[in-house]
């Protein structure tokens, strides 16, 4: 079922790619933390301080689907159409975790996709090093191919991040 949702997302994203990338548009994607009390929150605060950025948030609240029919329709519309458009037209995309629809989409060459990850350092296995089930590992590999940058806490951990994200 998830694969169907990812495929629908990708089709809508491709349509949204017909719109130009908007200079200064930044999409902050936080699929598991809607409060921005992590590295994405720091990026958001800095972008707001600098000004001149059109910040678009994509959080787990956009992804959650309700049992209430009206909320379900609104949530599905927001997830499939609004978040696809925001990603497709963003000049910069910052993520702090895996966002599996990335496995099915291709960004404009103008878009920079930055994985911040939600936990600095390498105290645990993460990304491709966490030995996920084969079907999840394949999705993660496809997601990682979309990253143009990954941020880590030190030069000393670059090899671990490179391995974890397949960079």
Stretch-by-stretch model annotation:
Residues 1-33, 74:
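Membrane-proximal basic amphipathic "stem/tether" segments
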């Amino acid at each position: 079922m998830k694969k169907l949702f990812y495929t629908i997302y990708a089709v809508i994203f491709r349509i949204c790619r017909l719109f130009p990338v908007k200079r200064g548009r930044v999409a902050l994607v936080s699929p598991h933390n809607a409060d921005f009390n992590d590295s994405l929150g720091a990026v958001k605060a800095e972008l707001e301080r600098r000004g001149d950025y059109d910040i678009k948030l994509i959080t787990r609240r956009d992804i959650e689907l309700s049992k209430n029919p009206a909320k379900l329709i609104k949530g599905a519309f927001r997830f499939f159409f609004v978040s696809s458009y925001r990603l497709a037209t963003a000049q910069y995309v910052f993520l702090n975790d895996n966002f599996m629809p990335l496995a099915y989409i291709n960004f404009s060459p103008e878009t920079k996709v930055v994985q911040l990850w939600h936990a600095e350092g390498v105290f645990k296995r993460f990304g491709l090093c966490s030995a996920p089930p084969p079907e999840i590992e394949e999705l993660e590999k496809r997601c990682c191919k979309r990253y143009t940058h990954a941020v880590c806490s030190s030069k000393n951990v670059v090899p671990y991040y490179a391995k974890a994200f397949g960079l």
